[in-house]
A protein has these predicted regions:
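Asparagine-centered strand-capping/turn motif at beta-strand->loop junctions
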Residues: 50-54
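Beta-strand-rich interaction surfaces with strong enrichment in secreted/lumenal proteins
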Residues: 20, 31-34, 48, 115-118, ...
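Extended, low-hydrophobicity, Ser/Thr/Pro/Gly-biased non-transmembrane segments
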Residues: 86-104, 108-112, 145-226
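Short aromatic-acidic-glycine turn motif
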Residues: 67-77, 211-214
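Short strand-edge motifs at loop-to-beta-strand transitions and within beta-strands
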Residues: 124-128, 140
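Short Pro-Gly-centered flexible turn/kink motifs
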Residues: 135-145
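Bacterial Sec-dependent N-terminal signal peptides
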Residues: 1-23
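N-terminal, polar/Ser/Thr-rich
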Residues: 17-43
Length: 226
């Protein structure tokens, strides 16, 4: 049986109070994740305290599920196959992924303040309509369970890259979409840049003790993991 190490990370993002004409949403995350280094799979739980600092009433939320782009036939794959100047790291490589090489990110049991939400997932975007509307200046708690698989490396994320990194994981968790003065930004992922909500991240990661975890934030339990 493999021994596992548990890493606690806390990432702080400065949050300022804004006037109604200059506001910004805030999402504070707590996540607990188990990583299987043999199968490249991971599973976890997530809690978000979402603050509506906008002058608008929020009736729904969107999440990004980026790893689902790394499957044959995805919007990212189709775009790369049909544009005249595809990213040379991508080209037709997604279309050639086998089932065991694909990425995945799936959500289940999504709740708002303890009550289950109905949601729909379409490739890299998830939509959930709130049971309780979120008024300006108010907060709500969103909780979910998720699982995923790290894909073969195509761009930045992936398995066993040429530098010897076993698991490169970026944008790997269900990520709440941004809401700003233009409204929601639930853009499907097609290998463009990311747009997200400011907030704090409190993350617990459990994996094989023989692996070294690198990341941003502040390690909370250095004495426990050596």
């Amino acid at each position: 049986m493999h021994m596992k190490s548990v890493f606690y990370l806390f990432v702080f993002t400065p949050f300022l109070l804004f006037s109604q004409s200059n506001w910004q949403q805030n999402a504070d995350y707590k996540m607990s994740v188990d990583v299987n280094v043999k199968t490249f799979a991971f599973k976890g739980s997530q809690e978000i305290v979402y603050a509506n600092n906008s002058p608008d009433t929020i009736t729904k939320v969107y999440y990004h599920l980026y790893f689902n782009a790394f499957k044959p036939g995805s919007q990212m794959d189709v775009r790369s196959l049909n544009i005249s100047d595809p990213d040379r790291r991508v080209k037709d490589r997604i279309s050639k992924l086998t089932k065991s090489e694909e990425g995945n990110l799936s959500v289940f049991e999504l709740k708002q303040d303890g009550k289950e939400l109905v949601f729909e997932q379409q490739e890299t975007v998830l939509l959930a309509r709130l049971n309780k509307i979120l008024l300006p200046g108010k907060k709500t708690k969103l909780t979910l369970l998720f699982n995923g698989v790290v894909p073969k490396q195509i761009r930045r994320s992936g398995r066993n890259n040429k530098d010897g990194v076993a698991l490169s994981m970026t944008q790997w968790f269900p990520k709440l979409a941004e809401y700003d003065f233009e409204g929601w930004h639930p853009n499907p992922y097609i290998a463009r840049e990311f747009h997200g909500v400011w907030g704090n991240y409190d993350v617990k990661i459990t994996l094989d003790k023989n692996y070294i975890l690198g990341g941003t934030g502040y390690l909370q339990n250095p004495n426990e993991i050596g």
